[in-house]
Amino acid sequence: MSAIGSILTNTGALDSLNAISNVSNTNNTLESELSTGLSISSPANNPAGYITAQGFTSQLNGITQAISNANTGVSLLQTAQGALTQQIGVVQQLNSIAVQAANGTQTSQEAASLQGVANQLTSQVSTIASQTQFNNINLLDGSFSNVQFQVGANEGQTISLSIGNTSAASIGLNASKASFGTTGVYNSKDNASSASGALTLGAPGAATGAFTAATVSWTSNNGGTGSAAVTKNESAASIASAVNATSGSTGVQAQATTSVTLTATAGASGFAFSLQGSGSSKQTINAQNVSDLVQQINGDTGTTGITAAIDSSGNLTLTQSQGQNINITGITSGSLATTGSTPKVLSTTNASGTVQGQVQLQSSAGFKVGNGSDIGLGSASTLHSLASINVSTVAGANEAINVVKFALQGLNNAGGQLGATPQRLTANINNLNTTAENVTSALGVVQDANIPQVSNQLTQAQIQAQAGVAALKSSTTLQQSYLSLLP
């Protein structure tokens, strides 16, 4: 209360001024909330709420950038997929060229022309691999390895991707071939001949030590392993079957065949012996001459799976296309002997023997072989690349068909991987959008102003301000009346 009659101190006016100042601050705060839509625009408004809001804001910014990163990744992968599609189309053309060249009806000039076309096509495959880029980053030359896409707001929220080298020199058939019987898998041979018949199977310098059973394993560079126990009597077909049983997880396939070339000499009674393929019944052969011998063997092919052919030199070739062992037993007339250094013998006596075959492991990707030396397999596959195909000969064209087959398989596998990754990124984008929506909602709860409530509070503050001004005016009226007493 002011001192009566004082014109120097007006407590009522001071109270009114203080109230007006407080209401003015409230007005400013409420007007700021209305103009910005935020109840927290600085730490002064609500320190704890401000910290929470900043945390949500940081998370939301990270999510927004992660969505952008993922969309960029999708664009990159679409670029790589488009290039792979072009390469696959070119390799399909190479397949047609190889099949055409394998027909055997081409002249030497036509074969050379086909090889020229093949060279151009393989060069185009390599050109696509070396020139495909995204933002100056090479995608298909093998350098795009273990690249991380940051697809989340936090550390470690990444998707990793590698794209192999798809140049013509880097794709094709990865293979390892073994000829059974090359390393200690048969007994010392008996080269005797007699009037009653003999069988001479073997090769110069053939091993005579006892075979030790082993487990051969194979591991693909793309992951996945398989193994098979190999015994002394194992056929190439059984090894191939074991390999193919795991091809779904390893990508490694196997082909088996058994073939042996023999010199056939008729005895006093022509040829008399028994012939059997692994798992088939024994067939008795009684032939007067080599021509009759071939006819009889081929007549039993449906049972034994063994075919016979005579070459221009008179050599007899026996083939079991599935890689089953060829068992020759009970020779009583005539003689058979391997030519050259064909190392395909399991065991021999004067009158019987078993011929093992070859098994070839093959894949579009590289692979390693454990204990492979026990059956003649190398420790790692050898690449027969698309760049090395030669379709100028029928034999080369047939090899090219297989190389092209696995080159296509490799490209298709890469395309499948690239096709799956954009789907993963798209799913991640959808999840991030949902997360961003929820974080935005939570941020709004923390910092957004309640406009109806703020409007009501502002109206109240404005009324209080008007009342304060009226009170201030009233409190100064009495002070002014004292001045009328002055003379």
Where are the model-predicted features located?
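Primary detection of the long, small/polar-rich alpha-helical "axial" segments characteristic
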Residues: M1-P487
